[in-house]
């Protein structure tokens, strides 16, 4: 199945049903008074995280989604039925953004989590609502309000503990193959990896973490060079980044310069992402003599002014990979669980009709005297 991690859709909540003007008419009760019922509320639109999905491809072809309209009110104080909601399943890790305002409506990170993205219209009020001691036969009603319409941008951000960064052919896919059961394509040409890959690493029994491999970055990626930076968003939820550097590139470029390119592109994309914990992992040490390796590593660390952890591995042989994974696992265990991490409280999403019913009732009651004057000396006709 094709991997699609970004789509644009439109969601239409259902309109509210109209209120009814009706009067009670029964045998021996010629003037029974108003009995028009309210309409039904329009259906809402929800997104729901479904762990059985891993792509947004379905919404590439089906882009318009509309909830059901509320039914109109009827006589005998019968309220119209509420419109049915619609629930759109999305993969865990999906973020919903309002295209018009740029407002992030929410993130769906757990299976079964729901997010309302469009609120149905409020029901219209029947004429029963407007009766009073001085207005016994009101001919007032309100129509249901239209449901909200939102153009949405859905972005899938993979849920992983560790993310891999590096130039093309730095050995990221080889590394993830050596430490997990993931089998991304590996070849000796750039951009072999075209989509993100996930792997589960198990350094010890009952211990595991998820690692994400994304396509490599090149200079100018922020301006769209290569595959651009579209896949960097998949690292935003990672708690640790592993920056893989090829110590012996086949084109004999400077490893330090390649590392600086990645750091610069990361900072251009998101300063917040650039501040995440990042470890330097020097790969392909098996292509050099042992005495050359340490010398080149020291030069690289000095050139980058690197003061963080540094690891040397040969991903193809698996040398150093297990030790690195154990260190990663130990580090992750020192961090708070993702569910208990402190997050800034998001502002509540404002929906169009949250206070509509209070405003309508206040407005109608304020205008009640004017309506009574209009009804003076008017003959009331009762009918079924």
Curated annotation (Swiss-Prot):
The keyword Protein biosynthesis does not apply. An essential GTPase which binds GTP, GDP and possibly (p)ppGpp with moderate affinity, with high nucleotide exchange rates and a fairly low GTP hydrolysis rate. Plays a role in control of the cell cycle, stress response, ribosome biogenesis and in those bacteria that undergo differentiation, in morphogenesis control. Mg(2+) binds at residues 173, 193. Monomer. Residues 1-159 form the Obg domain. Its EC number is 3.6.5.-. GTP binds at residues 166-173, 191-195, 213-216, 283-286, 314-316. Keywords: Cytoplasm, GTP-binding, Hydrolase, Magnesium, Metal-binding, Nucleotide-binding. Residues 360-377 have a biased composition (Acidic residues). Residues 160-333 form the OBG-type G domain. Its cofactor is Mg(2+). CDD domains: Obg. Residues 72-94, 358-384 are annotated as: Disordered. Belongs to the TRAFAC class OBG-HflX-like GTPase superfamily. OBG GTPase family. GO terms for cellular component: cytoplasm. It is found in: Cytoplasm. GO terms for molecular function: GTP binding; GTPase activity; magnesium ion binding. It holds the Pfam family MMR_HSR1. It comes from Idiomarina loihiensis (strain ATCC BAA-735 / DSM 15497 / L2-TR). Its main location: cytoplasm. This is GTPase Obg. One of its GO terms (biological process) is ribosome biogenesis.
